[in-house]
Amino acid sequence: MGQNDIMSTAEDFADQFLRVTKQYLPHVARLCLISTFLEDGIRMWFQWSEQRDYIDGTWNCGYFLASIFVFINLFGQLSGCILVLSRNFVQYACFGLFGIIALQTIAYSILWDLKFLMRNLALGGGLLLLLAESRSEGKSMFAGVPTMRESSPKQYMQLGGRVLLVLMFMTLLHFDMNFFYILQNIVGTALIILVAIGFKTKLAALTLVIWLFGINIYFNAFWTIPAYKPMHDFLKYDFFQTMSVIGGLLLVVALGPGGVSMDEKKKEW
């Protein structure tokens, strides 16, 4: 079987998967995407005093302001998740969750930690794709009305979302002289480039979903660590943040790469 035959078979599989799952794949994608906000909002409720004390100790802002910070995180994340899942005011929910990401990036000094910053940016990329999807749904009620100019922001949002999503994979690269890691880096880098430029996008994104899900289950198995150990919370944070990026990639699989992509340009050629 030649290289073209393998690619053709893989693309047929991706198309078949999309046909079978197209009814519920966007719902699964949204649930995965907001999972990190849902988990963090619930954690804020159960760890209210610990989070308040941490913010107060870090910024020396007093109990009142620290409590306001925890409340904003709790309410903002849970309400945003409810709106996204119920598909009501999704654009406002996305802007609110963007604000939560920015707030946490500053409050928890993520700005100075390149790995966590890249993961937060990847999470923002997922929200950007969700925002593009909500714009698409809003336009669908005007089917038949020319919207070429109005669709441009959506296309660039999809491009920005794809590019930001690949930052997640930059944090997974290993620079050890190990055959498995070298192979993983080569294959992973090729796939993220394909997603970023929008070439064979659905197949590349679906492959990344499978790969990332496997890595997530293996390396971030927080359920194997007792809840009282700090590593439990650390792995849980990593697990759900990775699930959110998986949700963003599933949106790419479900909706396609958008107008600013090699796949779309090929249709014009």
Swiss-Prot record:
One of its GO terms (cellular component) is Golgi membrane. Keywords: Endoplasmic reticulum, Golgi apparatus, Membrane, Protein transport, Transmembrane, Transmembrane helix, Transport. The chain crosses the membrane at residues 64-84, 92-112, 157-177, 179-199, 203-223, 242-262. It is a multi-pass membrane protein. GO terms for molecular function: cargo receptor activity. Its main location: endoplasmic reticulum. GO terms for biological process: endoplasmic reticulum to Golgi vesicle-mediated transport; Golgi organization; lipid homeostasis; lipoprotein transport; regulation of lipid transport. A motif (Di-lysine motif) lies at residues 266-269. It is found in: Endoplasmic reticulum membrane; Endoplasmic reticulum-Golgi intermediate compartment membrane; Golgi apparatus membrane. It comes from the Eukaryota. PROSITE patterns: SURF4. Pfam families: SURF4 (PF02077). InterPro entries: Surf1/Surf4, Surf4. Signal peptide: none annotated. Endoplasmic reticulum cargo receptor that mediates the export of lipoproteins by recruiting cargos into COPII vesicles to facilitate their secretion. Acts as a cargo receptor for lipoproteins bearing both APOB and APOA1, thereby regulating lipoprotein delivery and the maintenance of lipid homeostasis. The di-lysine motif confers endoplasmic reticulum localization for type I membrane proteins. Belongs to the SURF4 family. This is Surfeit locus protein 4. The gene is SURF4.
